């Protein structure tokens, strides 16, 4: 075996230099044989592969074409002529003779800007174009020395979520070479298409453009242009791009799409893009909407406003020869068909536009006269009760024979009275005669008018009113839409809130014996279609329709909900309610016995009956918190109920003293007396051990040196004051609770329909009467109930718990799950914890809050005389987890389980058309009697006005509907007085008498020395939220939906700004 010599670094360096010389010699030999050297290959690290292990002498192929049967690499130098000839025809051709060595020439290629440039071969790129070629430009299939006419400059888009609404526009050369090859991992390499022909994008945009991504979110096509949408991440940042795709393959056919999962973005797609795409139609509609709003604002600002008080002077009418009253000629009023009501008015054969001469109060239906002449004897146009009259003012009777009126143009005979009117008198109470109709005192046109009090006589003109027509008033396309009366026929009886409708009246809804009329975008569109030649109607329809179209587009593109189109159709098409003859009427009936309402027939609630199976559950006595105390201007010698008998009530003190887990505390204020056993402060160290040596007591003795002795005023500073407090949970002798279980409950509503009795339940909510069928919306039955019959201080009250208790679950400690004694002497549940007593000064900020659970606060009160002081005691909640207290009963029960939250809905079906009247005045003499925080219904009584049903509301809460006359009902009020009652839109204030909550609430009583207070039941925010969890949940959902819609719109505008001005 030959010996081996170790290789040193110097030997390795020599070997590498020798190999480099050999490679350069091979390159020079290849150049002498007219073979072009390979251009330098610069590819991104993310798309380049490993070239190790490849045969350096064999043909080199691109990584994207590796293993795909392609022997040619068109991304590098073009092949020799023989290979080009072989590619053009399958027949072999003889090889040409070797040419003499020459310098290789770079090929010419298209730049996309009408010229050509040499392709770089060796050395690093010197400009952005050379760098793009080095990154992977593929020349066309034909001769690279010629221009490629198919190459063009196209645009792709990129944007990043991390940079906000910043869009990047990438302009690049694109050759229609078909689908680009795939990499080894099956991904499409976009770097093969990257060859910018515009400004060079930033480096991070180029990196994102060349990032491989196999997920195609959608394929977009416009004309012959095709784009692929992708989203991916680069360095933790999410990017999106729209890449231009080739449209023709190698053989001229349509190029196939990348072999990945693709989808067409539409409403039926299960995958939704993250952004909203706006195109030209949306921008065009938005611009039209802004233009419409601007035009509408300009029209509203330029529209003239009429002065109702002093109308403009009319133009002078043409003279006409008429009857002679002395030496004067009359000027007849020429009333045309285009008056304020759109009717046809005629006086003789003369016509004139009355809207130019009639004053503004014509619209109100009141009296009004307008003089067309300045003479003492002249003609007037009078108006009253929505009728126009032709009147003549005169001082003496006219001739007995009529005179024909002859105009200048032709001779016609005007319509004149058959009988001359009798003379007029100055008295206002006189009349002009039987054949005269409607004329009366003149209304002053101006303040200086001297015709005050003169009687006007004349003849009634013929008035033919056209059919009633409606229009819609727009408010930028948003609800509510108002109905505008264009023409009104009085006999149709259209009213707005009980007031007759006139031309020009605007109202959300009109009511008549024929039915109801409302307005909606559908009606405006119908009017615009029917009046296609009217610019106003077309403009109104456009302004009403465009916002809904935009909302539909936003919802469809942003939310991608399948039901958006159906919901929009329902809103647009189902909001129109044309007037028609109704065959059914709907109203409400309050749920208190005695309530009545008026459908086509009167309906009255005679009573409510409750049916169930009852099982007795026994009786028990609940725990009750009781406290007492005393304020004394000296230290007592005996701190007990017997020793403090002069200051503390004996009976409560003994009951509390004998209770379990009592708390007894004695405080001494300024204990520096000149005599007795309280001379030193050391007597009052914690626990009061020294004090107990002289005064045996069961109370805890504590010093209170920081408190003021001002309660015992009028004494020197060494005055001593003591405070004594005692509290415990006791069995109240006058409070018992009896339990009854109700199963198979059913509520029976007893109704009287036009004198016919009828009972309705949830199983049978119909009443068949001779007048028609009445369907009642009966609330569901409450189900199983638990009744708590509470007796206290001679007053009995029942509370109802919904549902059966789960005695084997969380309700095991509830009163209904205990074994009760028949005599109500057993206390249920565990013994409560000991109350905590606390001495609080009168100016302590702590008094602004409520006592905590199980706490009792005592505060000295200055007396009205010297050495007289009182004590104010405040108690908090019970402060333990047991559920047998009255607080638990009130929190888990209700006073009326079968009382629904709202009135009963009544639907009366009849074959005759119906129209429900409506109250036109506020209710009178309404009185409210009750307690608004006791959980019991209050009594509401008063007088309902005439004119129809009175939907009574008390402080905004509907308490039922009543016919005209006296009504008495019960309502659960949650607000304190004053009470505002309304009916038919008219409101008034009711008188109220509030009952003390102490007499109605089932709560414990706190006893004091001079001041007796009631333990206040305060509701915390958590308790209020627990009681209104459904409303809060619904409100939160609505708020989230609204916030999402606003955020979506904001996002649309944000990214739309970036798309309009890309970088």
From Swiss-Prot:
Residues of the site described as Cleavage: 300-301, 582-583
Biased composition (Basic residues): 59-69
The UniProt record lists the keyword 4Fe-4S: no
Outcome after substituting residue 664 to S: Prevents E1-E2 heterodimer formation, and subsequent transport of to the plasma membrane. Complete loss of fusion activity in vitro
Organism: Rubella virus (strain M33) (RUBV)
Compositionally biased region (Pro residues): 93-107
Pfam families for this protein: Rubella_Capsid, Rubella_E1, Rubella_E2
Record protein name field: Structural polyprotein
Residues exposed to the Cytoplasmic side: 556-582, 1050-1063
This protein's domain notes: Structural polyprotein: Contains two internal signal peptides that are necessary for directing translocation of the glycoproteins into the lumen of the endoplasmic reticulum.
Annotated positions of the Phosphoserine modification: 46
Chain segments carrying region Functions as E2 signal peptide: 279-300
Biased composition annotated in UniProt, kind: Basic and acidic residues: 70-87
């Amino acid at each position: 075996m030959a010996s081996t010599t170790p290789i040193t670094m110097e030997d390795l360096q020599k070997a590498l230099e020798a190999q480099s010389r050999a490679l350069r010699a091979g390159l020079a030999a290849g150049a002498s044989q007219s073979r072009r050297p390979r251009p330098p290959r610069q590819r991104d690290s993310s798309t380049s592969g490993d070239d190790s292990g490849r045969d350096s002498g064999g043909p080199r192929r691109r990584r994207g074409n590796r293993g795909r049967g392609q022997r040619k690499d068109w991304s590098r130098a073009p092949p020799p002529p023989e290979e080009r000839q072989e590619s053009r025809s399958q027949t072999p051709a003889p090889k040409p003779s070797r040419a003499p060595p020459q310098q290789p020439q770079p090929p010419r290629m298209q730049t996309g800007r009408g010229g050509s440039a040499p392709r770089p071969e060796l050395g690093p790129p010197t400009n952005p174009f050379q760098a793009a070629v080095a990154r992977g430009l593929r020349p066309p299939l034909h001769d690279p020395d010629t221009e490629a006419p198919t190459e063009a400059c196209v645009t792709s888009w990129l944007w990043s979520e991390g940079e906000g609404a910043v869009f990047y526009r990438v302009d690049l050369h694109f050759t229609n070479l078909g689908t680009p090859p795939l990499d080894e991992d099956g991904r499409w390499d976009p770097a093969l298409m990257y060859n910018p022909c515009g400004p060079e994008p930033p480096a991070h945009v180029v990196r994102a453009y060349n990032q491989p991504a196999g997920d195609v979110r959608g394929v977009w096509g416009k004309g012959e242009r095709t784009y692929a949408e992708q989203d991916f991440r680069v360095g933790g940042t999410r990017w999106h791009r729209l890449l231009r795709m080739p449209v023709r393959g190698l053989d001229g056919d349509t190029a196939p799409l990348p072999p990945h999962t693709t989808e067409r973005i539409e409403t039926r797609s299960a995958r939704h893009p993250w952004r909203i795409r706006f195109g030209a139609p949306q921008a065009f509609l938005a611009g039209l909407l802004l233009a419409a709003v601007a035009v509408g604002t300009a029209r509203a600002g330029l529209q003239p406003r009429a002065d109702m008080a002093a109308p403009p002077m009319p133009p002078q009418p043409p003279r006409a020869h008429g009857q002679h009253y002395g030496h004067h000629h009359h000027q007849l009023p020429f009333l045309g068909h285009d008056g304020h009501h759109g009717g046809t008015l005629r006086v003789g054969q003369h016509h004139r536009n009355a809207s130019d001469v009639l004053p503004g109060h014509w619209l109100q239906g009141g009296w009004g006269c307008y003089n067309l002449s300045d003479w003492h004897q002249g003609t007037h146009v009078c108006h009253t009760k929505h009728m126009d009259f032709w009147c003549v003012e005169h001082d003496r009777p006219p001739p007995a024979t009529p005179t024909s009126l002859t105009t200048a143009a032709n001779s016609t005979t005007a319509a004149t009275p058959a009988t001359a009117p009798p003379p007029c008198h100055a008295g206002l109470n006189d009349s002009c005669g039987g054949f005269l109709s409607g004329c009366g005192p003149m209304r002053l046109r101006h303040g200086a008018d001297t015709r005050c009090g003169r009687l006007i006589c004349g003849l009634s003109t013929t008035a033919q009113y056209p059919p009633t027509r409606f229009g819609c008033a727009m408010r930028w396309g948003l609800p509510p839409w108002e109905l505008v009366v264009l023409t009104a026929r009085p006999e149709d009886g259209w009213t707005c809130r009980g007031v007759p409708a006139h031309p020009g009246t605007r109202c959300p809804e009109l009511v008549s014996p024929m039915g109801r009329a409302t307005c909606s975008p559908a009606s405006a569109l119908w009017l615009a279609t029917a009046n296609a030649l009217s610019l106003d109607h077309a403009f109104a329809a456009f302004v009403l329709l465009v916002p809904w179209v935009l909302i539909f587009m936003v919802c469809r593109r942003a939310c991608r909900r399948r039901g958006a189109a159906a919901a929009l159709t329902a809103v647009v098409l189902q909001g129109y309610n044309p007037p028609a003859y109704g065959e059914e009427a709907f109203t409400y009936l309050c749920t208190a016995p005695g309530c009545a309402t008026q459908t086509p027939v009167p309906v009255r609630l005679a009573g409510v009956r409750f049916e169930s199976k009852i099982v007795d559950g026994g009786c028990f006595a609940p725990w009750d918190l009781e406290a007492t105390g005393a304020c004394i201007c000296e230290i007592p010698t005996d701190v007990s109920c017997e020793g403090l008998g002069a200051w503390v009530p004996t009976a409560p003190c003994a009951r509390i003293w004998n209770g379990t887990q009592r708390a007894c505390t004695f405080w001494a204020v300024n204990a520096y007396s000149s005599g007795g056993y309280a001379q030193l402060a050391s007597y009052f160290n914690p626990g009061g051990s020294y004090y107990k040596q002289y005064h045996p007591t069961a109370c805890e003795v504590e010093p209170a040196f920081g408190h003021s002795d001002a309660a015992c005023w009028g004494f020197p500073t060494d005055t001593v004051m003591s405070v004594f407090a005692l509290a415990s949970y006791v069995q109240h002798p006058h409070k018992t609770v009896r339990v009854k279980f109700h199963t198979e409950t059913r509520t029976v509503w007893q109704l009287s329909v036009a004198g016919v009795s009828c009972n309705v339940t949830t199983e049978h909510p119909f009443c068949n009467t001779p007048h028609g069928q009445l369907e009642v919306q009966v609330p569901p039955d409450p189900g199983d109930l638990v009744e708590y019959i509470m007796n206290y201080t001679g007053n009995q009250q029942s509370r109802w718990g919904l549902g059966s208790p789960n005695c084997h679950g969380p309700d095991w400690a509830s009163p209904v799950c205990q074994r009760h004694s028949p005599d109500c002497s057993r206390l249920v549940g565990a013994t409560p914890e000991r109350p905590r007593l606390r001495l609080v000064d009168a100016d302590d900020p702590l008094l602004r809050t409520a006592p905590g659970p199980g706490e009792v606060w005592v505060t000295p009160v200055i007396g009205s005389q010297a050495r007289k002081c009182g004590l104010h005691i405040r108690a908090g909640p019970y402060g333990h987890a047991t559920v047998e207290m009255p607080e638990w009963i009130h929190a888990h029960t209700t006073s009326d389980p079968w009382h629904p939250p709202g009135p009963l809905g009544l639907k009366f079906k009849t074959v005759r058309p119906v129209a429900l009247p409506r109250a036109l005045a506020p209710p009178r003499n309404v009185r409210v009697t009750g307690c608004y925080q006791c959980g019991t219904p209050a009594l509401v009584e008063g007088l309902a006005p005439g004119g129809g049903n009175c939907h009574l509301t008390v402080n905004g809460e509907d308490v039922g509907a009543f016919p005209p006359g006296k009504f008495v009902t019960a309502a659960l009020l949650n607000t304190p007085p004053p009470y505002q009652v309304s009916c038919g839109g008219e409101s008034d204030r009711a008188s109220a008498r509030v009952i003390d909550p102490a007499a109605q609430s089932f709560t414990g009583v706190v006893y004091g020395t001079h001041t007796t207070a009631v333990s206040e039941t305060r509701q915390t925010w958590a308790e209020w939220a627990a009681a209104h969890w459904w409303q809060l949940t619904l409100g939160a959902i609505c708020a989230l939906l609204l916030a999402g819609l606003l955020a979506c719109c904001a996002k649309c505008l944000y990214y739309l700004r970036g798309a309009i001005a890309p970088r």
